[in-house]
């Protein structure tokens, strides 16, 4: 056996017979000087090593432990409140914005002079929620005691006040005092304004003049004039406003939406009275009667003459939606008509003096037509307009690009030409500069998860230039607006850094000044353990799918973290972006050491129409495959605890999270420990007609797609996993009926579920207190699910069963 002699326990072998000592018997003299030099050298080397370690260690690592973790309280605190100045251009050089302290300011870009139009204390004294300045800057319109109706719509009281210190004057219809209005807003000129009361439209030529009722056919809850009903607000126009001023203010286009044949839905109110009450409203479900719509134009100078714009004479348009209205000139209005199946659209230019509409462009799809409510941009004479349409770009299908349509004098034919092309999307056209022959737009040309501001020449070579690339630090996701002559632009950086707003010269991109830096939010972020964000791609069949991973700030490869998959997946949506966000997911990562992953799979937007429309008539099926591939990719990482994996989704994402929860892993074992769904869609025949029919076809013609996508077919496998369902009982978008139907199936399948309800609350949780409670509930559920104690690794459990 080999033995090793330690330095402190020397083993000495005595000399045997016949062996001679090779050294003398006198002990050697020690070299004390050499030893001292050696020790000094060692000390110098050690000090150099220590110094190097200190210098090379990142400062953030040494200070990380001193930083606070993000909490639920942070989400709703002033420290984390992003201030949006809501800047709006009103001329070639001037814009109006609201400063952080509340005052409304007029600022001149060239002189850098600022004028206070409205003191913040005046807004506070009126308890005003919204304000709007008249075009002549003489008056301000305030709204207060505002109550939400649906996602965008609201009712409230309105007052007018002369700038800067005038007394407030109530805005009311002639026949009613102290009226709660559905809408009020200025026109494009002077002090002209309209307001809507009981679905009728009233017009004031200027402040002080009595309002006149110009549209009188309204019927509360049934016939809407100038406003959207529920379906148009939520799914079609995506706005509560359904009226449009001509540029010169002489005419008003408005939609009349008739819900008289649409079935009624009743939302119960359980609290506040001995017997529950109900709120009825018209809600078209898949296959039921839809609202009818017509577009009218009224003249505002002289006698009001009401003229209806004629829809296309096309058999495919027997039932249609109006998805976009935009004035081209003071007498021409552009309208997009979309058939109920949402696979044929016709863009027309209507004469506001005759009602005759001329077809300018037609689009058709074998699946569905996406992005149908986007407005074209017109030249001043209306002969040329720019619009976004899907153009084939090779194997990845179609991408959305700018097309220009030019009409020639004395000719019925228009010239169509593409301005942009490539495997990326134009996400929005912003402005057209006729003087410089440039079009300004946002696009994903850099990366699908980014948004940058570009310009393109509209003549000759169509050369493009990125205006926002490398313009502002830590800013890759932007939006923008231009002054009236396009000499200046406001750049709103929305991420990945803390949002900022800056003002730039268009010619040389020079930054003129910072309008909002959100410095307090930046300080709060710097003081917190914010998640590390990583981006990856996974290969699924013929697609390369983007993935976003949020890791704790203190992440190390040697630890084991629970994994949460967050799904949205609404067709055309995007989860993986570089926008700045601080949400309950941030809290789960920062305070509770979870890893969160998101993946934009088939059905998501901004990666071509081929990937987008793969999910047609089979919602859930392909999304499950892609999301599970993202989970499998993460489970290959050593730092992920395979016994603590969860999934969460909201709305359509709630449908997907419930669909995915029973999914099996590669060894046919359960992948997910738990899951949660907030306001889940569970049966598409119970959901809004425009949404369900867009992706599954018209209900009643072929219902197989509706039957196949029911969650009832999936939840029978939910036995062991913890499952939390959260739903508001007065949800006007996804009715509690969805959850009730799901629970019936869960009980039959003996599933382990929990239900949390919010009595009498709407879909959008307008109350801050309820939003905070909701965040705590979701976080608390996953923290409990991820607890390590009493958890037995799956492999160990199986081995013990085999031994028994």
Curated annotation (Swiss-Prot):
**Disordered as annotated region, ranges:** 1-25
GO BP term, pick one: regulation of postsynaptic membrane potential
Can you cite an annotated GO cellular component? membrane
User: Where is this protein found?
Assistant: Cell membrane
Coiled coil: which residue ranges? none
- Please outline how this chain is modified post-translation: N-glycosylated.
Q: Which GO terms describe its molecular function?
A: potassium channel regulator activity; serine-type peptidase activity
Q: Does the keyword Membrane apply?
A: yes
Q: What is its main location?
A: membrane
- Superkingdom classification of source: Eukaryota
The record's disulfide annotation reads: 350-357, 466-469, 475-493, 674-785
Expression sites (tissue/organ): Detected in brain cortex (at protein level).
Q: Which residues lie on this side of the membrane: Cytoplasmic?
A: 1-34
Phenotype upon knockout is: Knockdown animals obtained using siRNA technology have smaller brains than their wild-type littermates. Performance on the standard Morris water maze indicated spatial memory defects and learning disabilities.
Biased composition (Polar residues) is annotated at 1-11
Keywords per UniProt: Cell membrane, Disulfide bond, Glycoprotein, Membrane, Signal-anchor, Transmembrane, Transmembrane helix
Pfam families, alphabetically?
Answer: DPPIV_N, Peptidase_S9
Membrane topology of this protein: Single-pass type II membrane protein
For this protein, the parts annotated as crossing the membrane are 35-55
Q: Which InterPro entries match?
A: AB_hydrolase_fold, Peptidase_S9_cat, Peptidase_S9B_N, Serine_Prot_S9B/DPPIV
**Quaternary structure (record):** Homodimer (in vitro). Interacts with KCND2. Identified in a complex with KCND2 and KCNIP2. Forms an octameric complex composed of four DPP6 subunits bound to the KCND2 tetramer. Interacts with KCND3; this interaction modulates the channel gating kinetics namely channel activation and inactivation kinetics and rate of recovery from inactivation.
Known function: Regulatory subunit of Kv4/D (Shal)-type voltage-gated rapidly inactivating A-type potassium channels. Modulates the activity and gating characteristics of the potassium channel KCND2 amd KCND3. Promotes cell surface expression of the potassium channel KCND2. Has no dipeptidyl aminopeptidase activity.
Q: Which family does it belong to?
A: Belongs to the peptidase S9B family.
- What protein am I looking at? A-type potassium channel modulatory protein DPP6
- Give the gene symbol: Dpp6
């Amino acid at each position: 056996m080999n033995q090793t002699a330690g330095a402190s326990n020397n083993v000495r072998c005595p000399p045997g017979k016949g062996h001679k000592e090779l050294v003398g018997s006198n002990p050697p003299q020690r070299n004390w000087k050499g030893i001292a030099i050696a020790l000094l050298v060692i000390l110098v080397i050690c000090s150099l090593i220590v110094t190097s370690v200190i210098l090379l260690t990142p400062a953030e690592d040494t200070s990380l432990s001193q930083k606070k973790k993000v909490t639920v309280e942070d989400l709703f605190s002033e420290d984390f409140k992003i201030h949006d100045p809501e800047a709006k251009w009103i001329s070639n050089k001037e814009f109006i914005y609201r400063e952080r302290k509340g005052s409304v300011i007029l600022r001149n870009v060239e002189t850098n002079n600022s004028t206070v139009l409205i003191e913040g204390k005046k807004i506070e004294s009126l308890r005003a929620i919204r304000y709007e300045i008249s075009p002549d800057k003489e008056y301000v319109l305030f709204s207060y005691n505002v109550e939400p109706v649906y996602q965008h719509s609201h009712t409230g009281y309105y007052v007018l006040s002369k700038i800067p210190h005038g007394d407030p004057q109530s805005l009311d219809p002639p026949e009613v005092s102290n009226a709660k209005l559905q809408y009020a807003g200025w026109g494009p000129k002077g002090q002209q304004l309209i307001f809507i009361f009981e679905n009728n439209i009233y017009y004031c030529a200027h402040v002080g003049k009595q309002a006149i009722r110009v549209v009188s056919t309204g019927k509360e809850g049934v016939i809407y004039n100038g406003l959207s009903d529920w379906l148009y607000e939520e799914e079609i126009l995506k706005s509560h406003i359904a009226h449009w001023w001509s540029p010169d203010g002489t005419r008003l286009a408005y939609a009349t939406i008739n819900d008289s044949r649409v079935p009624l839905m009743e939302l119960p109110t359980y609290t506040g009275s001995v017997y529950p009450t109900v709120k009825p409203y018209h809600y078209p479900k898949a296959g039921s009667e839809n609202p009818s719509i017509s577009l009218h134009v009224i003249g505002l100078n002289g006698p009001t003459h009401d003229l209806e714009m004629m829809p296309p004479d096309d058999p495919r348009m027997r039932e249609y939606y109006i998805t976009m209205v935009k004035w081209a000139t003071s007498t021409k209005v552009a309208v997009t008509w979309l058939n109920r199946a949402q696979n044929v659209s016709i863009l027309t230019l209507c004469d506001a003096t005759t009602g005759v509409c001329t077809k300018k462009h037609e689009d058709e799809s074998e699946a569905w037509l996406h992005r149908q409510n986007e407005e074209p941009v017109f030249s001043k004479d209306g002969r040329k307009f720019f619009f976004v349409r899907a153009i084939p770009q090779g194997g990845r299908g179609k991408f959305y690009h700018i097309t220009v349509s030019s009409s020639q004098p004395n000719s019925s034919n228009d010239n169509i030409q593409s301005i942009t092309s490539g495997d990326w999307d134009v996400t929005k056209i912003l402005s057209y500069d006729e003087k410089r022959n440039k079009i300004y737009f946002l696009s994903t040309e850099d990366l699908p998860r980014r948004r940058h501001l570009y310009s393109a020449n509209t003549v000759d070579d169509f050369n493009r230039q990125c205006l926002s690339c490398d313009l502002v630090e830590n800013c890759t996701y932007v939006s923008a607006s231009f002054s009236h002559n396009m000499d200046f632009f406001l750049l709103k950086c929305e991420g990945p850094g803390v949002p900022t707003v800056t003002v730039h010269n268009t010619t040389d991109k020079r930054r003129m000044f910072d309008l909002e830096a959100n410095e307090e939010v930046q300080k709060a972020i710097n003081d917190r353990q914010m998640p590390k964000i990583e981006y990856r791609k996974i290969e699924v069949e013929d697609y390369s799918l983007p993935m976003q991973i949020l890791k704790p700030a203190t992440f190390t490869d040697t630890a084991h973290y629970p994994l949460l998959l967050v799904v949205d997946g609404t067709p055309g949506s995007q989860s993986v972006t570089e926008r700045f966000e601080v949400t309950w997911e941030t809290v789960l990562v920062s305070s509770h050491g979870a890893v969160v992953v998101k993946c934009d799979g088939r059905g998501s937007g901004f990666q071509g129409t081929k990937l987008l429309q793969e999910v047609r008539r089979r919602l859930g099926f392909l999304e499950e495959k892609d999301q599970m591939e993202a989970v499998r990719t993460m489970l290959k990482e050593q730092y992920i605890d395979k016994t603590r994996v969860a999934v969460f989704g909201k709305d359509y994402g709630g449908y997907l999270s419930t669909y995915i929860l029973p999914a099996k892993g590669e060894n046919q074992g359960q992948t997910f420990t738990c899951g949660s769904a907030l306001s889940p869609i569970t049966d598409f025949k119970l959901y809004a007609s425009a949404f369900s029919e867009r992706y599954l076809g018209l209900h009643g013609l072929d219902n197989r797609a509706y039957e196949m996508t029911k969650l009832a077919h999936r939840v029978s496998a939910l036995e062991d996993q913890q499952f939390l369902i959260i739903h508001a009982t007065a949800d006007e978008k996804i009715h509690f009926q969805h959850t009730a139907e799901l629970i019936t199936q869960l009980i039959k399948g003996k599933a382990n579920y929990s239900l949390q309800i919010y009595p009498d609350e709407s879909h959008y949780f307008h109350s801050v207190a309820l939003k905070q409670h909701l965040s705590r509930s979701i976080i608390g559920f996953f923290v409990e699910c991820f607890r390590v104690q009493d958890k037995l690794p799956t492999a160990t459990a199986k081995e013990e069963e085999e031994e028994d």
